[in-house]
């Protein structure tokens, strides 16, 4: 174990110093994906002028309507983001944060980081109990769990710099949905009963919104959010200052002060969304752009793709034991590196160029045995941890001019803390749990972190969110992303591999069964749908196969050679919708 750790550190150091490794030549790139229909089992939604894919049908229609009115992809994305804060309160939000990947019609690709920040009064050991162990109640359900929200700042930055419509126009549909209400769908009803019951009933402000006659709202009930509508109206009228310096800031700060939270008006006034350079890589002739730190997603998607490029994935075939073995082993190495090197780049030096280098990937590829799995303990030791659920949301937008936007944002766990700030109607995040409360001990998603992701004032916690844009021959080819905690990275990875290596259209790639390995716990998690024979072969190779529930909820758009848009929403989310015109 020590030798393996030293080997990885030596390789990283060598790459930072300009070293190299000699390996075999790469396999030839696969043929381009087919856009035919006769031979396909799953068929994507088609449109020519613009398209939106999101987890909620109402929000998707809001975005398409903005596109029809002449708005661009950024205008539509901001409208969808605010709409989801109303219609998908499990994760859609203005009290949380996230990331946006954006590619303009002129070919500029950029990343907007609106991840939450730790308050000024945050301390490294704030989530430890008297025995020095992490206290999940503090980091998940208390007022201490909330970081300074970033969604409003992120949407405003994107709209001001890259949009064409005013804020008071794109936010108007969300205000209407909040004030007039909408019919609760299956997904919201189920999540209120399953997850909401754990956090919402303890808080009267929250219970007054989402409960009726002592029970969570059911499918078919109307959810009206008058106070949230008033908050959105303030943002429409006064811009982000309403949230960060005005009446909404007062509500959040007062809520925190009354209940032992840390966010102050100074924290809110000092929050800034940041535009960053995306992580980029080349995979079999395609350019892949994804989020840089404090998201770990982009680095590790590119890292794993670089490793896979040393194997003939097309020859192995989708769902084969060899393909799954190689991908699982590559994922182990990437997640081990995540725990060691990743954090907020404004606070720690993240060696992302070394981690995403072809040479480093080839060195790892040389360690992968197609016929024998390497135990995670031989990559780096750590503790076992529980499985996680889908508790984030993603949406994708492409407009008639070729502008493309991918957004993943969240409250962290479903409904966040369950706390509504005063009379604002705004649910608050529990994103502070994404910090490493104690190095080497897993968070709610089973992810192990180190000192690079320790709690510090004004720091942004590490994330797995991975909004991703793939480019072919200089043009946007795939816009994708997913919720799913630690499985976000591997879900997005499989969308890329399924389309590029296995020639699937976007609907086929979305419907295909998924699998996941995150190094710790040392198990290969698989959805239903893989052949029992394949799973037996994987076990014979040394994989510890565990059948799990559905993974991820991708919302993706593929652009054909002629500009035709092909979209697909994930069947794992029953109320999502892809639509265009």
Model-derived regions, located:
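Bacterial N-terminal signal peptides that target proteins for export
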Residues: 1-11
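Bacterial N-terminal signal peptides
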Residues: 9-20
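Noncatalytic scaffold domains of N-terminal-nucleophile
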Residues: 26-61, 73-74, 78-239, 243-245, ...
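Internal maturation/activation junctions in enzymes
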Residues: 30, 311-411, 423-424, 439-440, ...
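Alpha-helical support elements that line or immediately flank enzyme active sites
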Residues: 66-67, 153-161, 238-245, 250, ...
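Active-site rim segments in enzyme catalytic domains, especially the processed small/beta chain
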Residues: 86-111, 262-264, 404-472, 502, ...
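Active-site Gly/Thr loop motif
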Residues: 263-284, 358-387, 428-467
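Extended C-terminal subregions enriched in glycine
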Residues: 438, 459, 501-549
């Amino acid at each position: 174990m020590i030798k393996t750790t030293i080997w990885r550190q030596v390789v990283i150091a060598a790459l930072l110093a300009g070293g190299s490794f000699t390996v075999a030549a790469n396999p030839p790139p696969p043929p381009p994906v087919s856009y035919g229909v006769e031979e396909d089992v799953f068929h994507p939604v088609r449109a020519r002028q613009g398209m939106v894919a999101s987890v909620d049908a109402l929000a998707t229609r809001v975005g398409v309507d903005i596109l029809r009115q002449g708005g661009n992809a950024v205008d539509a994305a901001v409208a969808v983001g605010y709409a989801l804060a109303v219609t998908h309160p499990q994760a859609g939000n203005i009290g949380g944060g996230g990331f946006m990947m954006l590619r303009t019609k002129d070919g500029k690709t950029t990343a907007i980081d609106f991840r939450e920040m730790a308050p000024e009064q945050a301390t490294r050991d704030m989530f430890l109990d008297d025995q020095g162990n992490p206290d999940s109640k503090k980091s998940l359900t208390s007022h201490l769990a909330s970081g300074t929200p970033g969604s409003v700042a992120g949407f405003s930055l994107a709209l001001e710099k890259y949009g064409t419509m005013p804020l008071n126009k794109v936010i108007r549909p969300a205000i209407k949905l909040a004030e007039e209400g909408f019919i609760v769908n299956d997904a919201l009803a189920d999540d209120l009963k399953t997850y909401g019951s754990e956090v919402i009933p303890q808080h009267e402000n929250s219970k007054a919104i989402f409960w009726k006659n002592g029970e969570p709202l059911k499918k078919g009930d109307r959810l009206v959010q008058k106070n949230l509508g008033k908050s959105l109206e303030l943002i429409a009228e006064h811009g982000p200052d309403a949230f960060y310096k005005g009446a909404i800031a007062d509500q959040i700060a007062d809520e925190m002060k009354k209940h032992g939270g840390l966010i102050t008006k100074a924290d809110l006034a000092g929050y800034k969304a940041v535009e960053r350079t995306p992580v980029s890589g080349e995979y079999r002739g395609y350019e892949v752009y994804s989020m840089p730190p404090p998201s770990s997603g982009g680095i590790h998607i590119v890292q794993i793709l670089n490793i896979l490029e040393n194997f003939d994935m097309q020859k192995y075939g989708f769902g084969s034991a060899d393909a799954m073995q190689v991908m699982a082993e590559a994922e182990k190495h990437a997640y081990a590196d995540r725990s060691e090197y990743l954090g907020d780049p404004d606070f720690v030096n993240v060696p992302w160029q070394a981690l995403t280098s072809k040479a480093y990937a080839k060195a790892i590829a040389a360690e992968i045995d197609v016929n024998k799995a390497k135990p995670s303990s031989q990559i780096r030791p750590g503790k076992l941890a529980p499985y996680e659920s889908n508790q984030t949301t993603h949406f994708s937008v492409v407009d008639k001019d070729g502008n493309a936007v991918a957004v993943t944002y969240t409250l962290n766990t479903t409904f966040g803390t369950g706390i509504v700030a005063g009379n604002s109607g705004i649910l608050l995040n529990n994103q502070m749990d994404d910090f490493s409360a104690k190095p080497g001990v897993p968070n709610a998603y089973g992810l192990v972190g180190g000192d690079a992701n320790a709690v510090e004032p004004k720091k942004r916690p590490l994330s797995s969110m991975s909004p991703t844009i793939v480019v072919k021959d200089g043009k946007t080819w795939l816009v994708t992303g997913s919720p799913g905690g630690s499985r976000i990275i591997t879900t997005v990875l499989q969308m890329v591999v399924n389309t590029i290596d296995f020639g699937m259209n976007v609907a086929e790639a979305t419907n295909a069964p998924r699998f996941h390995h995150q190094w710790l716990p040392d198990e290969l998690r698989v959805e239903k749908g893989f052949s029992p024979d394949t799973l037996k072969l994987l076990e014979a190779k040394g994989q510890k196969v565990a059948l799990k529930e559905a993974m991820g909820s991708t919302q993706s758009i593929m652009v054909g050679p002629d500009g035709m848009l092909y979209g697909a929403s994930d069947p794992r989310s029953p109320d999502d919708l892809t639509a265009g015109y």
